[in-house]
Amino acid sequence: MLTELVALDGGSFRMGSTQFYPEEAPVHTVTVTPFAIERHPVTNAQFGAFVSETGYRTVAEIAPDPALFPGAAAADLVPGALVFRATSGPVDLRDWRQWWDWIPGANWRHPSGPESSIEGRSEHPVVQVCYTDAVAYARWAGRRLPSEAEWEFAARGGATTTYPWGDEAAPGGRLMANTWQGRFPYRNDGALGWAGTSSVGVFPPNGYGLVDMIGNVWEWTTTRFTGRHRLGAPAAACCGPQAPDPSISQALKGGSHLCAPEYCHRYRPAARSPQSQDTATTHIGFRCVADG
């Protein structure tokens, strides 16, 4: 039931970028040791097997601790998660709160709220999993989450171009990843029929045979996010929290189906984004690695 691992020899590569967003700098040389990475993100079916065997409950399925939210109304301290909602028209893209809602009852089984389900989506990436949930699955699987350096090394697929497939986002008009097609955040024409997550492996693999490294869902890494790359940071990491710390943000990689050129041009290996450890959303998933 676990995802097939693809063995990578490791090596040195140039990590980061100075062409897009300041947090991707500086470009620097990083060496990663041999490791193996899952060919695709963890799916709903795979996460379901973990839950069935262990009885695990995700953070989104547990009511928030009142001690962490002093002054919050009891009615607000119920299980739930962040859900993307398309707007009715153009909005100020500087305010993400216009398209994200906290929905009671949203969790990995019901990604968009209590009335939604994952029926017929067993091969879609699992979402509504926070960092702690991803770490728990990885430990159950006898694996771990990748560091940011390991993830970027794998995502590049041996290439040095902007995207794993070249320097054009859609060469010859061909869509290479599940990203937002249309005008964000109010009109999504769908990528090859997908408006939201897509089944893993719909889009072409990179040079290492890995799929969905770019687009579909952002992926958790073990690297704590800083405003710029921290030179000398460990290229590998193997630990994670027993409980999420909302004051700590992890580095997300890969972009998602919500990334669009005019808003989030982060569907590239070098791109990175912060997310607090306790946050689950409709556009974040993960994949695991194993030591080589």
PLM feature spans:
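GGW-centered surface loops in extracellular recognition modules
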Residues: 1-7
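Short, P/G- and charge-enriched loop/turn segments at secondary-structure junctions
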Residues: 22-27, 94-96, 271-277
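Short capping motifs at secondary-structure boundaries
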Residues: 35, 50-59, 141
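An anion-binding catalytic pocket shared by soluble metabolic enzymes
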Residues: 38
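Short, structured beta-strand segments at or near domain termini in extracellular proteins/domains
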Residues: 282-292
